[in-house]
């Protein structure tokens, strides 16, 4: 009997360590997870491949997707648009997959309106703003202006913590991963979001 999947939605500031934690999660639960590949209007960065890291599309194509309700969620981030396909997400859920989103607060709020009963939301951040700044400087991928903008965006997103189901302060990687892992395992077996009537019928037919 295959249970319905759910959406594990991750948000948090750039530099908080989301990608590192998600990589560890996929290493352990690869067969159960489906990573939602976003569509974006921004240009590919070095090493990024279309259809693997993102679906790179034009502004015109993205606008058509908005108009036709193609996206489960979409948002404008740093002058570019990002969005997640509703159809691909639903197909993965129907196949019992845990669909992983790594999206910002804007996208989370839109996705929640369309699929609230399927979403488990986790906000991942650093212990404080200074620690986040240190990590971003160490990463050395942003200009000073971009760095300040990321820090301001992080401050704005921190105001939305109460909207999320869980909060992980990513100060120690092992502890943070165990917390994320525990959230995933607990929600694999919850009754919320399942077709309980169908499950009961299948169970009775097996008598």
Swiss-Prot record:
The keyword Nucleus does not apply. SMART domains: GuKc. It catalyses: GMP + ATP = GDP + ADP. It comes from the Bacteria. It is an enzyme of class 2 (transferase). It is found in: Cytoplasm. Pfam families: Guanylate_kin. One of its GO terms (cellular component) is cytosol. Its main location: cytoplasm. InterPro entries: GK/Ca_channel_bsu (IPR008145), Guanylate_kin-like_dom (IPR008144), Guanylate_kinase (IPR017665), Guanylate_kinase_CS (IPR020590), P-loop_NTPase (IPR027417). Residues 5-185 form the Guanylate kinase-like domain. One of its GO terms (molecular function) is guanylate kinase activity. The keyword Cytoplasm applies. Its EC number is 2.7.4.8. ATP binds at residues 12-19. Keywords: ATP-binding, Cytoplasm, Kinase, Nucleotide-binding, Transferase. Essential for recycling GMP and indirectly, cGMP. Belongs to the guanylate kinase family. NCBIfam families: guanyl_kin (TIGR03263). This is Guanylate kinase.
């Amino acid at each position: 009997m295959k249970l319905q999947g759910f959406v594990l939605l991750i948000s948090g500031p750039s530099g908080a360590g989301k990608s590192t934690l998600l990589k560890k999660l996929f290493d352990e639960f690869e067969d159960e997870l489906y990573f939602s590949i976003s569509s974006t209007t921004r240009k590919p960065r070095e090493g990024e491949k279309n259809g693997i890291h993102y679906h790179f599309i034009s502004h015109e194509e993205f606008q058509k997707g908005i108009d036709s309700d193609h996206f489960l969620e979409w948002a404008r981030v740093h002058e570019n648009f990002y969005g997640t396909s509703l159809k691909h997400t639903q197909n993965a859920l129907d196949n019992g997959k845990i669909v992983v989103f790594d999206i910002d607060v804007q996208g989370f709020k839109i996705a929640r309106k369309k699929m609230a009963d399927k979403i488990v939301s986790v906000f991942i951040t650093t212990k404080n703003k200074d620690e986040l700044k240190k990590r971003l400087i160490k990463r050395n991928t942003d200009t000073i202006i971009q760095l300040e903008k990321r820090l301001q965006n992080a401050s704005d997103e921190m105001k939305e913590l109460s909207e999320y189901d869980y909060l992980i302060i990513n100060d120690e990687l092992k502890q943070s991963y165990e917390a994320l892992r525990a959230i995933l395992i607990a929600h694999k077996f919850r009754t919320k979001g399942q077709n309980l009537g169908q499950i009961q019928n299948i169970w009775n037919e097996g008598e």
